[in-house]
From Swiss-Prot:
Keywords: Hydrolase. Changing C166 to S/A: Loss of activity. It catalyses: formamide + H2O = formate + NH4(+). Residues 14-260 form the CN hydrolase domain. The gene is amiF. The keyword Metal-binding does not apply. Asp-168 is probably not involved in the catalytic mechanism, but is probably involved instead in maintenance of the structural integrity of the amidase. Expression of the amiF gene is stimulated in a mutant deficient in arginase activity, suggesting that production of this enzyme is regulated to maintain intracellular nitrogen balance in H.pylori. GO terms for molecular function: formamidase activity; N-carbamoylputrescine amidase activity. The active site is at E60 (proton acceptor), K133 (proton donor), C166 (nucleophile). This is Formamidase. It comes from Helicobacter pylori (strain ATCC 700392 / 26695). The lineage of its organism: Bacteria, Pseudomonadati, Campylobacterota, Epsilonproteobacteria, Campylobacterales. The keyword Amino-acid biosynthesis does not apply.
Length: 334
């Protein structure tokens, strides 16, 4: 449910705060350091204003910004773990909260492009989840495709947390993967501009409904002299309804109460529309246990490495050249 300005911890759930961080204008490493200081200051201020909050979420690109002319340069990249994540860890430990942070991560393989990474830090200051974006926003983003799968970790109030990053949320199979591994609160951190505002709202709701899990999503807000970033933090119930919807204001704090046990109970007790179960047990009324092979061609082809669309040979954009990226692969933009 919506927090109605609640400041206390709910009895059987937890209070979450999603920060509509102003889109950073970043031109130097000093600007990144300033962003980190601002994020830490905001984390402490949010905890002071909402003493019962247990999870604070910052959007994609809030640490390093979106300067596309420099975002691949060594000056702009960070390591995970690294001294910057240690600062975030110290803040979470001091505030006694879980925190979600965005990092453009230097690839350990210097011959490959960087990763777009999200981390969850617990109240003890430990990184308990590290996720690398599986589906960069092609053809704009130059990030290397993630290699850590979709991890799930324990969170506050009986939650099992997973994080997706921006365009990942448009891939329904990824939300299903998180739920299949036990996630009941699916976090989405984004740096979208207004072109996909409606689709953002739609997919946050559909990811919740299709998988009987809460979704908590937050986007950058404000104007960076090129695009406007819409903010609109959103918390969705496991039945796909919107519990809380933010506005387009930079610095808006979107809060809500989440009860993971309710999602767990729905998964255990629902018959109608328990679709995450039905996928692997279709027709279980007529056939005891149901049919376990979903019979979906694209799943079989994907598993076999043969995924190909009927119109794929005629597609006009299949690389990053429209944005000036080379098409030869390998590390570029140093």
């Amino acid at each position: 449910m919506g927090s109605i300005g609640s400041m206390g911890k709910p009895i059987e759930g937890f209070l979450v705060a999603a920060i509509q961080f102003p889109v950073p204008i970043v031109n130097s490493r000093k600007d990144i350091d300033h962003n980190i200081e601002s994020i830490i200051r905001t984390l402490h201020a949010t905890k002071a204003g909402y003493p019962g909050v247990e999870l604070i979420i910052f959007p994609e690109y809030s640490t390093q910004g979106l300067n596309t002319a420099k975002w691949l340069s060594e000056e702009f990249l960070l390591d995970v773990p690294g001294k910057e994540t240690e600062l975030y860890a110290k803040a979470c430990k001091e505030a006694k909260v879980y925190g979600v942070f965005s990092i453009m991560e230097r690839n350990p393989d210097s011959n490959k492009n960087p990763y777009n990474t999200a981390i969850i830090i617990d109240p003890q200051g430990e990184i308990i989840l590290k996720y690398r974006k599986l589906f960069p926003w092609n053809p704009i983003e130059p990030w290397y495709p993630g290699d850590l799968g979709m991890p799930v970790c324990e969170g506050p109030g009986g939650s099992k947390l997973a994080v997706c990053i921006c365009h990942d949320g448009m891939i329904p199979e990824l939300a299903r993967e998180a739920a299949y591994k036990g996630c009941n609160v699916y976090i989405r951190i984004s740096g979208y501009s207004t072109q996909v505002n409606d689709q953002w709202i739609l997919t946050n709701r559909s990811n919740a409904w299709h998988n009987l899990m809460y979704t908590v999503s937050v986007n950058l807000a404000g104007y960076d002299n090129v695009f406007y970033y819409f903010g609109e933090g959103q918390i969705c119930n496991f039945d796909g309804t919107t519990l809380v919807q933010g506005h387009r204001n930079p610095w808006e704090i979107v809060t809500g109460e989440i009860y993971p046990k309710m999602a767990d109970n729905a998964r255990l007790s629902w018959g109608l529309e328990n679709n995450i179960y039905n996928l692997g047990h279709r027709g279980y009324v007529a056939k005891p246990g149901g049919e376990h092979d979903a019979g979906l061609t694209y799943i079989k082809d994907l598993a076999a490495g043969k995924y190909k669309l009927p119109w794929e040979d005629h597609m006009k954009i299949k690389d990053g050249s429209i944005y000036g990226y080379p098409t030869t692969g390998g590390r570029f933009g140093k």
